């Protein structure tokens, strides 16, 4: 009894810490997004959004091959050699890369945008790494403090600089550098030891996980990246604002669960309870479908009027918003399933599935965007992540229940623009019934294995 109570307290503490960190992100977004969208024209806001997106790619390219393997082999607070190795590797790679990126913009008159990309990327990488360290060492409140520090510094800096008419890209870069300072302040002390250390993980694992993460991010942002050459700047700003809204709402909710659960599921797997871990992951996928369905239904019932009160008129397009909500849910399902391949050390499956989904999905997104503008970009993103999730299910031994729920959900959202509001809500309700049925079946499996 005492053991179960201790475990429950650990879960509660972790969930509370992550919740506080996510709420801080939402509050920051509630401050930042309306200010920027009201102060800036859609064209100006689009330039800031694109700088942030490219900065994310900088972070992925320079840091993910180190951060993701560290997440699988984190060591502990008592054994910090892996942390020391990862810290040194990141410094050696990221700092020279940032200098090269900034200098690369000089010949083309693009120093400002390149500074924004490099600064934002450094901030995201540093903040993500330190937060990951604390999370995997089961120190959730240190994790929360790290994220809140980074989020707060980035938000305050970018809003303050934009309000005093600093160039948007420069503001983005300065905000990223401010969060680097915060990450360094809250970082654990490095372990003493030899300056040279053998890599704790294989090169193939790091590269495979990094390529999978890069492909995932490309699918997330590809629509925003190609829209400037296909539609007007106003539509680019609309799409960027809706994408950020989805990321900071349903994306934040799903991210909370993902963040809390992964370290504990990895611990459960390492203890030898592999079947139970797989069943939990399957259940998470179905619950994600339910969250997506209820989110779509809630937006349909409320309409765009409430959202326009926050953003101002002309930012929200309902079919686009619904497709982006569904794409976020599908992407999280794929991420959950990828945990199986990470835990089994089959990282090549993540690489292959993600790259194939990205190739096919990006081609679909281009074609759909050419035909339907921002609606096509959102639908292409949904198709990309649906394919990503289905490919990840191969060789995962998770069964068909999450697949059934996912396909029902995607079908309902995809046919939405062809139906009137009432018919679409009825179909969405039917998808909820299907997902609930699969959820109950999987829950019985979890209960039996426990």
Predicted regions mapped to residue ranges:
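Transmembrane helical elements of multi-pass membrane transporters/channels
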Residues: 13-25, 29, 150, 170-186, ...
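Helix-loop junctions and terminal segments of transmembrane helices
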Residues: 60-78, 242, 246-285, 338-343
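Interfacial segments at transmembrane-helix termini and the short loops linking adjacent helices
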Residues: 42, 104-120, 298-335
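Short runs within selected transmembrane alpha-helices of multi-pass transporters and secretion channels
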Residues: 25-29, 33, 51-71, 116-135, ...
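Hydrophobic transmembrane helix module of multi-pass membrane transport proteins
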Residues: 89-213
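Membrane-proximal transmembrane or re-entrant/amphipathic helices at the cytosolic face
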Residues: 1-4, 419-450
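Alpha-helical transmembrane segments of polytopic membrane transporters and translocases
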Residues: 30-34, 45-62, 223-224, 237-254, ...
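Interfacial transmembrane-helix starts/ends
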Residues: 12, 49, 75-93, 273-290, ...
């Amino acid at each position: 009894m005492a053991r179960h109570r201790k475990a429950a307290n650990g879960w509660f503490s972790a969930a509370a810490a992550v919740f506080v960190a996510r709420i801080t992100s939402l509050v920051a977004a509630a401050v930042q997004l309306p200010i920027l969208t009201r102060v800036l024209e859609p064209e100006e806001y689009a330039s800031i959004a694109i700088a942030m997106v490219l900065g994310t790619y900088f972070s992925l390219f320079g840091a993910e091959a180190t951060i993701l393997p560290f997440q699988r082999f984190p060591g502990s607070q008592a054994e910090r050699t892996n942390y020391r190795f990862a810290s040194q590797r990141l410094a050696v790679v990221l700092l020279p890369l940032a200098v090269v990126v900034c200098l690369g913009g000089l010949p083309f008159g693009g120093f400002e945008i390149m500074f924004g990309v490099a600064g934002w990327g450094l901030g995201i990488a540093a903040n993500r790494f330190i937060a990951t360290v604390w999370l995997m060492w089961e120190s959730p409140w240190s994790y929360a403090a790290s994220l809140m520090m980074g989020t707060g510094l980035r938000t305050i800096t970018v809003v303050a600089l934009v309000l005093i008419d600093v160039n948007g890209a420069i503001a983005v870069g300065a905000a990223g550098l401010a969060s680097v300072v915060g990450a360094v302040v809250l970082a654990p002390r490095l372990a003493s030891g030899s300056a040279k250390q053998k890599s704790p993980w294989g090169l193939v694992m790091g590269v495979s996980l990094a390529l999978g993460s890069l492909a995932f991010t490309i699918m997330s942002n590809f629509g925003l990246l190609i829209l400037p050459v296909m539609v007007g700047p106003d539509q680019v700003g609309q799409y960027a604002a809706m994408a950020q809204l989805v990321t900071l709402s349903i994306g934040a909710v799903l991210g909370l669960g993902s963040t809390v659960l992964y370290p504990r599921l990895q611990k459960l797997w390492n203890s030898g309870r592999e079947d139970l871990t797989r069943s939990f992951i399957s259940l998470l996928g179905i619950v994600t479908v339910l969250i997506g369905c209820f989110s779509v239904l809630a937006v349909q019932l409320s309409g765009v009027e409430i959202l326009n009160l926050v953003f101002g008129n002309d930012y929200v397009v309902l079919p686009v918003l619904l497709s982006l909500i569904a794409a976020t849910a599908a992407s999280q399902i794929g991420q959950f399933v990828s945990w199986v391949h990470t835990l089994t050390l089959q990282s090549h499956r993540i690489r292959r599935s993600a790259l194939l989904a990205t190739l096919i999905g990006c081609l679909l997104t281009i074609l759909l965007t050419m035909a339907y503008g921002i609606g096509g970009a959102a639908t292409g993103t949904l198709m990309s992540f649906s394919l990503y999730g289905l490919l990840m299910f191969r060789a995962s031994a998770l069964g068909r229940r999450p697949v059934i729920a996912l396909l029902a959900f995607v079908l309902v959202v995809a046919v939405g623009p062809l139906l009137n509001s009432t018919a679409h809500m009825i179909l969405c309700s039917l998808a909820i019934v299907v997902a609930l049925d699969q959820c109950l079946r999987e829950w019985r499996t979890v209960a039996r294995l426990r």
